[in-house]
């Protein structure tokens, strides 16, 4: 049995989510577990520790919390805030303390991102009675703070004020030395400008985090003007995480489908090609949606429903287990199978192949003023406000399906984003909806800037 304190960080790629396994003297706690919970069980075996506590920092909106799944496997109780009417687990409140070996965890209520947000303050009593770690959930990140728009505009000012108070009255006074372990890293939808860092400190954030430099009035004003999109699947996650998600017990089995069986399912299934943009453009099965693999953990929630079976097309099917994990983390248990042999099998079988044109930024620059083109910027509005290609029209990729009437069917459609990945999603949506001439600008804004071409602002 290990005597010293153990802290393991479990990262969920794509979601940029971080959960934590902490333990001491044969006992362990898990904070904000993901749904595929084998990592925590494996760590408990590795360190010879029994998981005795499971904590949730808030009701997450971007992924399915794995607390019930983990509790089912290890028998540990679940704890979350009293300030939301959860239909499972046990409630905690400000000042509650829990002993895990020599570790003491104290609950600090830190509302703002959500009303029920809590942070967990850690002391290693074998070393000192002073706290030196705080798990901040979605309250404080490296270089950023949590978003405050989850409940809508009516209470946005109120939530921004609560977040400011949580930061300045609860967290910052703990001291510059305290290590901060947040629930997300760079790339998460839960904060706009999160810096990639394994951890940070309160002192470092005081010096470098722009959101901690603002007065309360400036902070609230910034939050009121912050523009971030809310994916439709968030509502599903909130229901699952409040009421309890269905138990999986194991990863879904994805059935390998031969060409004949695959073709039988095309009309009744959601077929997703998870290859990168250039590969998809070079050849794909007609009618399929392209979401690159790492993008599944967010954009599947915009593009796929939770009822119809999902079938996956990959390059060589080396990542099927990983793809299944990505999808179940946001509640897609309706995964049915995959094309055995990948797209290569389809191509080698003499089946029809659909293509999407690819343009370089130089191609677009050369034809930028061509009136036969309809150029679409599919980035978020906040990105567009920082600069866009002159003559382009803005339709966010997640909204494109509902705004196809705005896209003329008698013009050549050119799509761009920041790198070409989201543009490939958009191009596949357009193709499946009957648009014949569609091009994806590979490299998109990043390449446009690198080439020295100008952007405009409103």
Residue ranges, per PLM feature:
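Conserved beta-strand hairpin/beta-sheet module of binuclear metal-dependent hydrolase folds
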Residues: 2-50, 120-137
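Divalent metal-coordination and catalytic microenvironments
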Residues: 22, 32, 58, 70, ...
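Active-site neighborhood of phospho(di)ester-bond hydrolases with catalytic His/Asp-centered motifs
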Residues: 30-31, 51-60, 79-82, 109-112, ...
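Active-site metal-binding loops of divalent metal-dependent hydrolases
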Residues: 33-34, 59, 114, 133, ...
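Active-site metal-binding motif and surrounding structural segment of the metallo-beta-lactamase
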Residues: 37-79
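Divalent-metal (often Zn2+) His-rich catalytic cores of metallo-beta-lactamase-fold enzymes
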Residues: 127-128, 133, 143, 155, ...
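Rhodanese-like catalytic fold shared by cysteine-dependent sulfurtransferases
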Residues: 147, 204-236, 245, 250, ...
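A contiguous, basic/glycine-rich beta-loop/short-helix subdomain that forms a polymer-engagement track
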Residues: 250-261
